[in-house]
Every structure is written in structure tokens, then in C-alpha cells.
UniProtKB/Swiss-Prot annotation:
Keywords: Host cytoplasm, Secreted, Signal, Virulence. Has the canonical translocation motif RxLR, but lacks the canonical EER motif, which characterizes most oomycete effectors identified so far. The leucine heptad repeat region contains five protein variants with 12 amino acid polymorphisms. Leucine heptad repeats are a feature of coiled coils where the leucines are embedded in an alpha helical region. Three of the different variants were recognized by RPP13-Nd, suggesting that alteration of the amino acid sequence in this region is tolerated. The ATR13 effector protein is a highly polymorphic member of the RXLR class, yet only a small subset of the polymorphic residues appear to be involved in RPP13Nd-mediated recognition. Polymorphic residues of ATR13 appear as clusters across the surface of the protein. ATR13-Emco5 is recognized by RPP13-Nd because it has the critical residues Phe-73, as well as Thr-119 and Arg-148 within the highly variable C-terminus domain. Coiled coil: none annotated. It comes from Hyaloperonospora arabidopsidis (Peronospora arabidopsidis). Belongs to the RxLR effector family. Residues 104-154 are annotated as: Highly variable C-terminus domain. This is Avirulence protein ATR13. One of its GO terms (cellular component) is extracellular region. Residues 50-92 are annotated as: Leucine heptad repeat region. It comes from the Eukaryota. InterPro entries: ATR13, ATR13_sf. Residues 93-103 are annotated as: Single repeat region. Secreted effector that acts as an elicitor of hypersensitive response (HR) specifically on plants carrying defense protein RPP13. Recognition of ATR13 by RPP13 initiates defense responses that are effective against oomycete, bacterial and viral pathogens. The allele ATR13-Emco5 recognizes RPP13-Nd, the RPP13 defense protein from Arabidopsis thaliana ecotype Niederzenz.
Amino acid sequence: MRLVHAVLLPGIIVFVSNGNLLHAHALHEDETGVTAGRQLRAAASEVFGLSRASFGLGKAQDPLDKFFSKIIFSGKPIETSYSAKGIHEKIIEAHDLHVSKSKNAPIQYASVMEYLKKTYPGPDIERIVSTLERHDEVGAKDLGAKLRDALDRQ
């Protein structure tokens, strides 16, 4: 997979390649993750014509897993760069709000980095972090650097 864009915040990770949303994973079912999840489910409804009720938050530990496993196994990514762009902006706004109000953000970043290292070992993690470092144009400055610092301090 050629990763060209990644968005991360303490509750959720989104990977986008060539404008197609490929995968999202909620790490924690906190309020921020729920907000981002709603945006993702809305996009899914729009693209696949699926009922939003299909993705009820109480149905699984990670409400997005069931939906995204369907995409991964079908081999058909969501093909809507417009929706993906809107999701990026909303997730980054939620991230900025969360970090400005949370003293625990660095600890959460460190745990997310550990998760990423296990899931995407080797040079892939560097690629993900480097994409995070290029988010200043949309308001989430130096996310990659914050992740590295948090991991070093852990």
C-alpha cells in the first residue's frame, strides 16, 4: 500500500491512499473517537447507501471494525476523495480541541505510537509519522514530532 495521507488523534487513526479511505481504527471509545466515528459512518452511508443504524456504537468493542473489515475483505476502498477530505478536517479539528483540553494527550500519543509500531513494523511507521508531520496546512501542527517526543519520554 502506498500511504499518501494519515490522520491521527488519541481516539482514531485514518489511513488514506490516493484519495481513497482505506482503513480506520478506533483505539479508545472516548468522546473524540466517537465524533470521528460518526463522520466516518456518515461517509460510509453516503458512499455505500448503508443505513447509519447499521453501525450502532453499542454493538461492538470497536464499532468501526465490522464495517472496515468488509471493505478490506472486499478489496474495494471507499472512492470519495471529497468525503475523505471533509473527514480529515473534522478529525483534525477534534484533535486540536482534545489536545488543548487534555493533559494526558502526550501519554495517549505514546500509546498510539506503540500500537502503530506493532501494527506497521519497520519503515512503514516512519512513513506514517512523516505524513503526520506535514499537517500544518490544516491546523494540526507537528503531530509526528509530538508522537516521537511522547515515545521518548515514556
